[in-house]
């Protein structure tokens, strides 16, 4: 079963955004729902706030298990998720466990936009099969050297500012951030 699930995840990861048969989506959604229940869901509202700010919660764990209004994905500039089979990045996990609908919706967003998503901006989509309601997609900096430029140092802050603004535009939703 583990090797079959790994094969399915690999195929989901490499598949380009193309329409899917309703029958396939029904089976995929049932599988992802069963997997979500097996892994367990963490209720974001039940996590204790930090001592410094009652609005802030720090949690180490799998963001794809978190029931929250919105989770933030450190995405690539195409917003299509990671295409590397079973890669360990957060982008791969979010796109895998949300289901293949997420890649399709992101592709529609990007086609309508007409260009790659700039670093430090954000877009909101449904979370589909994740326990959260929305996914906020933001693109962090790519630092090919060990020494980031001054602009690259500022870019994560832009992501952290743009994500709540994007969520507020969709709905005033509390956010769960991954590291960007």
In which residue ranges do the predicted regions lie?
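Macrodomain-like recognition of ADP-ribose-binding/processing modules
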Residues: 1-180
């Amino acid at each position: 079963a583990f090797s079959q699930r790994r094969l399915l995840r690999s195929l989901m990861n490499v598949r380009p955004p193309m329409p899917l048969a309703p029958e396939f989506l029904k089976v995929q959604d049932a599988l992802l729902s069963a997997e979500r229940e097996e892994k367990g869901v963490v209720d974001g509202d039940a996590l204790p706030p930090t001592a410094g700010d009652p609005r802030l919660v720090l949690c180490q764990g799998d963001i794809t298990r978190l029931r929250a209004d919105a989770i933030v994905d450190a995405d690539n500039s195409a917003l299509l998720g990671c295409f590397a089979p079973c890669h360990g990045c957060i982008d791969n996990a979010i796109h895998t466990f949300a289901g293949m609908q997420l890649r399709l919706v992101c592709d529609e967003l990007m086609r309508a936009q007409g260009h790659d998503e700039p670093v430090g901006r954000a877009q909101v989509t449904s979370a589909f099969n994740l326990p959260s309601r929305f996914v906020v997609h933001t693109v962090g900096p790519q630092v090919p050297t060990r020494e980031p430029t001054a602009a690259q140092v500022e870019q994560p802050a832009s992501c952290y500012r743009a994500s709540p603004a994007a969520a507020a535009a969709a709905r005033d939703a509390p956010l769960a951030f991954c590291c960007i």
